[in-house]
Amino acid sequence: MVIAVYPGTFDPFTRGHEDLVRRASNIFDELIVGVAQSPNKRPFFALEERIEIAREVLGHYPNVRVEGFSGLLKDFVRKNGARVIVRGLRAVSDFEYEFQMAGMNRYLLPDVETMFLTPSDQYQFISGTFVREIAVLGGDVSKFVFPSVEKWLKEKTGKTEGSGKSE
């Protein structure tokens, strides 16, 4: 049984993230979506909210589970018995950072492989940062996130679609 971990902050969980989960879940026996605490970032949603959002979106995948974690990814991977770390590469600009991270993970976890997946064409430009910025300004994010995530964003920002004003 091959277990993989797909780690990230998922702030918020986008259609691009789901695209990678869908595809990775077809490759591995079990896929664990690891929602990272990320103390160096200032997340828009709290860890518990990000876990709940990801579970709402991914609940229909029988071989996918969502768990939060803090600390080192290597410890989370070991705890879950994973043999593969899945990472997404949207653009060439992601490659340098992800390549360095894969090298460090190989050093820390020599028996664990990193697998890069590129998103489907329609999701290559989506990033959580862009989605948050659009949502905060009251823009339409429905093409980038699932309806449940859009609801979370509207509740968090107090913005109505397209108005740029608070409700």
Curated annotation (Swiss-Prot):
Its cofactor is Mg(2+). It comes from Ralstonia pickettii (strain 12J). Substrate binds at T9, K41, L73, R87. GO terms for biological process: coenzyme A biosynthetic process. Keywords: ATP-binding, Coenzyme A biosynthesis, Cytoplasm, Magnesium, Nucleotide-binding, Nucleotidyltransferase, Transferase. This is Phosphopantetheine adenylyltransferase. Homohexamer. The keyword Metal-binding does not apply. InterPro entries: Cyt_trans-like, PPAT, Rossmann-like_a/b/a_fold. Its main location: cytoplasm. It holds the Pfam family CTP_transf_like. One of its GO terms (molecular function) is ATP binding. One of its GO terms (cellular component) is cytoplasm. Gene3D superfamilies: HUPs. Belongs to the bacterial CoaD family. Reversibly transfers an adenylyl group from ATP to 4'-phosphopantetheine, yielding dephospho-CoA (dPCoA) and pyrophosphate. Its EC number is 2.7.7.3. It comes from the Bacteria. Pathway: Cofactor biosynthesis; coenzyme A biosynthesis; CoA from (R)-pantothenate: step 4/5. ATP binds at T9, F10, H17, G88, L89, R90, E98, Y123, Q124, F125, I126, S127, G128, T129. It is an enzyme of class 2 (transferase). It is found in: Cytoplasm. It catalyses: (R)-4'-phosphopantetheine + ATP + H(+) = 3'-dephospho-CoA + diphosphate. The record marks H17 as: Transition state stabilizer.
